[in-house]
Amino acid sequence: MEQYSILGRIGEGAHGIVFKAKHIETGETVALKKVALRKLEEGIPNQALREIKALQEIEDNQHVVKLKDFFPHGTGFVLVFDFMLSDLSEVIRNYQRPLTPAQVKCYMMMLLKGVAFLHHNNIMHRDLKPANLLISPSGHLKVADFGLARLFSNQGERLYSHQVATRWYRAPELLYGARKYDEGVDLWAVGCIFGELLNSSPLFPGENDIEQLCCVLRVLGTPTQDSWPEIVELPDYNKITFKENPAIPLEEIVPDTSSQAIDLLYKFLVYPSKQRCSARQVGNRKWSPGPEVMFSRVRVQ
């Protein structure tokens, strides 16, 4: 720790405090995440271990935050990351400078590239949300916070916790208690983030799990066995019933948006997980959320 000079406190998460620091020898500005162990006998928290393991599993990628180092410190340890100026939630909430269609597209392209890279490496993030998408001083978006990340298998036999993902971005199968799921939970979250970029507010702002499900059903309509055959296999399917509700066109939920962007939103926000368009597929498509803008000409300030 003595090789770093603390410049200030950035924030605090469930398992640690994040500081802005400078490496004394190189002058590089970094972010230090200090994780304290409440009891030595309990060892390193599972979420911290998952974050380290996930970031060690993947190679450097310009759209995934880099774990530069980690080392023991006192009764805990420190993770060293690239320093990032802000996060996407701060960008969205900046009402003085609303996002332009070109900026929405730029951020989405970077998000899709990061998620495609993770899924190619068999990693489910399981907590994608604007606050976990960090923005570098140069404007690059990077996926961060891998405390809930898990390696996944295409065999589909492994059981996972359904208590993952921040509620507003939680896929409907998780809200119905699914223990067997795939990277589609990340793709649903990508759709929610996309809608929030377009609308400057969350698409499904539920205050509890039941209300969250109601928010989704109110927009996408009540699912049936025809529209979502797997729903009858979900653990909580028979625990609560909803009256039949027709879908509301997304054009009404996200007004003043191009037909291409609406079409893309529909490809993420679909009930059956297997029908959600992969990040790699979308990254290869040509689309525009508004005026025709070439991605190569977009520079995020």
Predicted regions and their residues:
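Conserved N-lobe ATP-binding subsite of Hanks-type protein kinase domains
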Residues: 17
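C-terminal lobe substrate-recognition/regulatory segment of protein kinase catalytic domains
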Residues: 222-267
